From Swiss-Prot:
It is an enzyme of class 6 (ligase). This is Leucine--tRNA ligase. Signal peptide: none annotated. A motif ('HIGH' region) lies at residues 42-52. Its EC number is 6.1.1.4. NCBIfam families: leuS_bact. Belongs to the class-I aminoacyl-tRNA synthetase family. InterPro entries: aa-tRNA-synth_I_CS, aa-tRNA-synth_Ia, Leu-tRNA-ligase, Leu_tRNA-synth_edit, M/V/L/I-tRNA-synth_anticd-bd, Rossmann-like_a/b/a_fold, tRNAsynth_Ia_anticodon-bd, Val/Leu/Ile-tRNA-synth_edit.
């Protein structure tokens, strides 16, 4: 073997070997336990970042170790290839999105292969491939048949720059999440999926502490996020009546303004109602009020997420309209509020300022009456300032509420529901925050929705035999909207499946979350042209703990930023596929790991014009105070900036650490890292620096340390290669029994340390605590390097055994180096390639100690330690303790009154 560690040669040779063997192609094998681990598929943006490296290395370590333990493992990979970034890149570079996407896929695939990932590339998919998205379209048609998919017109968030609909979560401070353009409200038709039909089941399986919860292998934080997003609320839905008539002379909404509340016990405290800007009553009032019309237009530009509405200033205008309180008959004024969403509930809320903090602030701002109707013993109510107890329903009882007086919350709600039901104006109801999933997107680069529009027959589904509806690959967006609308080729030859007349295709495409809602199942049957999923999915997605039901994939890995939308949609999609008889599982992912972000230092300065520009860490050095704390930064190299060339020593602002980002110039290019140090170093560093679920703060010095560690391992292997290893390897490989080897004291000590660490490492692998796996490997190499008793009985066998264990422990993290040393030192000749070598077993005999150390105390005070035989009885321990020099020194010749022995721990001489 080479004398010095050359990562380029080592990694090239290992990858060539695995490629020649087709080492990671996997088939279904009923004779082995299966394990399916999958990382969230990446968007082909052009290059991998360190977050990708960390995610995929976690997956790789998991599957490599389990393969050694006899599992049939699957680690696939694909590309989430549709979406707006490709269109925008195409617009900028004047090339079709398909060309940009496939070029990026090719480059990123090479990067993954350079990482040495154990991916079965025979199962590779790209969601922009017609062979893949055909099944998006097929299942959409099935949902249409079952009534799960439907078409409706609804007010949506419209990004005027990207010219597409945005989900509420994609609107930030009233602007599009990607373009930053002010978002408009538009009413347009689109297709929706009835995820709300599955709301209860989606909640049951994820609910923390719920008796039907199955996703106990998910982080509690993610489960709570989904639980809150689904948002089940129990309360009362009721109507305020009115006789407000529209242009047609009929009462608007049949003369009823419906609201939902979880605090029906405060109904007697209603002093106003607020409706959403798009509510029919608001629009009716705005028709004769320019001021109100202008306010409504302004509201359309605001943020639409609940989180944004919670923090923005509450504003409103009175409509001049009044509705009737259903229990008191009092007239209640209707306001338009910028904090009311038309898409939630009925687009209206009752205002109870005395007992709702938001309503209290609104009433104080606009001088609306505040009426107390609940009380808590020992508390005094004031309209001057809000106090938390005003909204307390646990201790509250009703006052000033007629026949509700004296009732606690639950009883009062029941009574109100009874009174409203008697009037035909309300009932108890369960509501959900969850809304049906709008899947129509007004953009080109996505799955075509398989609908044909006929002037006579309307919207008609494309016959299944005509799938896929293929997206043109050669269109280049010009910024003027969806190019499918103008593409004659896309519509050429299209006829209505009902009447046969010439027709046009639907030009909306599907939300890209559709693509990522089931790709992990397609990996299981990636080349099946006849079925969406088949036997492969039945094998890989089966629950190993039950014949049917339960969860499928064994381990899913990805960022917590996908906790709600992607994971919720994937769960819904799986349940739909189950109900259509395509799969047998209730949930897609048995266990979920949300890996932490990779962070790095951020450096910036303001230009002469006030803009902020960022600097690469490699060009900056820190300034420290006397305590060693970073207090600033300065350039250590000349750097071009908007203000010209900045000299060395220029002061730079230090912003602390944050997520690696292209925009902040604080990312690390994995390719440069691999070229300089090797893939094994990159992998080892990302695993060692922090537990997988925690953030990783980048440290160049620690990267160097990881490289030096690998060099130590290689150098020790080179040292062993000078020994006659044949016989020792045979013993380690089982060709000869270790029971026949006589180990001396030093060899036994080495084996004790190696097997003790191995026992902990085994536990750490089970917990996916890979940082402590690596630290265990470091303890092993320390023990091996410290071993000097080469003439000791069994020394050679102990060394070879210990190094073989180390290589297998390290192999999942640093497969190239482990492969090279395993082969060069002869282990492979007896145990096969390291990727298929059996996982090392802890030898119970190695953990048996001939001697143990006991703490020595005199009169309860620590005076040293003694070595005794592990089988020594109390009398023997007493004899050794009393003969100890330190014991004699501190007893000063006195006869001990007694000697206390705590087995395995200490001996205390009392004088």
């Amino acid at each position: 073997m080479q004398e010095k560690y050359n990562h380029i040669d080592v990694e090239r040779a290992a990858q060539d070997h695995w490629s020649a063997r087709d080492a990671y192609r996997v088939t279904e094998d009923q004779a082995k336990p299966k394990f399916y681990a999958c990382s969230m598929l990446p968007y082909p943006s052009g290059k991998l970042h360190m977050g990708h490296v960390r995610n995929y290395t976690i997956n790789d370590m998991l599957t490599r170790q389990l393969r050694m333990k006899g599992y049939n493992v699957l680690m696939p990979m694909g590309w989430d290839a549709f979406g707006l970034p490709a269109e925008n890149a195409a617009l900028k570079n004047k090339v079709p999105p398909a060309q940009w996407t496939y070029d990026n896929i090719a480059y990123m695939k090479k990067q993954m292969q350079a990482m040495g990932l154990a991916i079965d590339w025979s199962r590779e998919i790209a969601t922009c491939d017609p062979d893949y998205y055909k099944w998006n379209q097929w299942l959409f048609l099935k949902m249409l048949e079952k009534g799960i998919a439907y078409r409706k017109t609804q007010v949506v968030n419209w990004d005027p720059v990207d010219q597409t609909v945005l989900a509420n979560e994609q609107v930030i401070d009233g602007r599009g999440w990607r373009t930053g353009a002010p978002v408009e409200k538009r009413e347009i038709p689109g297709y929706y999926l009835k995820i709300t039909d599955y709301a209860q089941e989606l909640l049951d399986h994820v609910q923390v502490g719920g008796d039907k919860a199955t996703l106990t292998g998910w982080p509690e934080k993610v489960r709570l996020m989904q639980e809150n997003w689904i948002g089940k609320s129990s309360g009362v839905r009721f109507a305020f009546t009115h006789d407000i008539r529209g242009a047609d002379g009929q009462p608007i909404q049949d003369g009823r303004l419906y609201v939902f509340t979880t605090r029906a016990d405060t109904i007697m405290g209603v002093t106003f109602c607020a409706v959403a800007p798009e509510h029919p009553l608001a629009l009716h009032a705005a028709a004769t009020s320019p001021k109100l019309a202008a306010f409504i237009e302004e509201c359309k530009k605001g943020g639409t997420t609940e989180a944004e509405l919670a923090v923005k200033e509450k504003e409103g205008l009175p409509t001049g309209l009044f509705v009737t309180h259903p229990l008191t008959g009092a007239q209640v004024e209707v306001w338009v509020g910028n904090y009311v969403l038309m898409s939630y509930g009925d687009g209206a809320v009752m205002g109870v300022p005395a007992h709702d903090e938001r309503d209290f602030a609104f009433a104080k701002k606009y001088g609306i009456a505040i009426r107390q109707v609940i009380a808590v013993e020992g508390e005094t109510f004031s309209t001057e300032a809000w106090a938390d107890w005003y909204g307390d329903k646990q201790r509250a009882v009703c006052i000033e509420s007629g026949e509700l007086d004296g009732l606690p919350h639950a009883a009062a709600v029941d009574k109100v529901a009874e009174l409203l039901a008697a009037k035909g104006l309300g009932e108890k109801k369960t509501t959900w925050r969850l809304r049906d999933w709008g899947v129509s997107r007004q953009r080109y680069w996505g799955t075509p929705i398989p609908i044909i529009h006929c002037e006579d027959c309307g919207a008609q589904p494309v016959p299944a035999k005509d799938l896929p509806v293929v997206l043109p690959q050669d269109l280049v967006p010009d910024g003027s909207g969806n190019p499918l609308i103008k593409s004659e080729a896309f519509h050429a030859g299209v006829v209505c499946p009902c009447c046969g007349k010439s027709a046009r295709r639907e030009t909306d495409t599907m939300d890209t979350f559709v693509d990522s809602s089931w790709y992990f199942m397609r990996y299981c049957d990636a080349r099946n042209s006849e079925q969406m999923v088949a036997e492969g999915a039945e094998y890989w997605m089966r629950d190993q703990n039950a014949a049917t039901g339960g969860s499928g994939m064994d381990q899913y890995i990805g960022g917590i930023e996908h906790a709600i939308l992607h994971l919720l949609y994937a769960r819904f999609w799986t349940k739909v596929m189950r109900d259509l008889g395509l799969v047998k599982v209730d949930e897609p992912f048995t266990k979920l790991l949300t890996q932490g972000m990779v962070l790095n230092h951020i450096y910036s300065r303001r230009t002469a014009k006030g803009a902020k520009e960022y600097f690469w860490p490699k060009d900056v050095e820190h300034v420290f105070d006397e305590t060693g704390k970073i207090v600033g930064a300065k350039l250590k190299a000349e750097v071009d900036s908007a203000d010209g060339l900045l000299p060395v020593g220029t002061d730079i602002d230090y912003e602390g650490v944050g997520t690696m980002s292209k925009s902040k110039n604080n990312g690390i290019d994995p390719q440069e890292l691999i070229e300089k140090y090797g893939a094994d170093t990159a992998r080892l560093y990302t695993m060692f620096t922090a537990p997988p679920e925690l953030t990783l703060e980048w440290n160049d010095a620690a990267v160097e340390g990881s490289y030096r560690f690998l060099r130590r391992v290689y150098n020790f292997g080179a040292k062993l290669s000078q020994m006659d290893m044949a016989g020792a390897v045979q013993s380690v490989a089982g060709a000869k029994s270790l029971d026949d080897v006589e180990f001396g004291k030093a060899a036994k000590s080495l084996r004790l340390e190696i097997h003790t660490v191995l026992k902990q490492v085994e536990y750490d692998y089970q917990r996916m605590q890979y940082n402590t796996v690596v630290s265990g490997a470091m303890k092993m190499i320390n023990a091996l390097e410290d071993f000097k008793s080469f003439d000791d009985a069994g020394a050679q066998v102990a060394l070879i055994e210990g190094f073989g264990i180390l290589l297998r422990v390290l192999y999942p993290a640093t497969p190239h180096l482990a492969h090279a040393l395993w082969s060069e030192l002869g282990y492979a000749a007896h145990l096969g390639d390291v990727l298929d070598a059996p996982w090392p077993q802890v030898d119970p005999q190695a953990l048996v100690q001939d001697e143990i150390s006991l703490v020595l105390q005199v009169n309860g005070k620590l005076r040293g330690a003694i070595l005794v035989s592990s089988t020594a009885d109390k009398a023997e321990i007493e004899r050794i303790a009393l003969a100890n020099e330190e014991c004699q020194k501190f007893t000063n010749g006195a006869v001990p009154k007694k000697v206390i022995v705590v087995p395995g721990r200490l001996v205390n001489v009392v004088v």
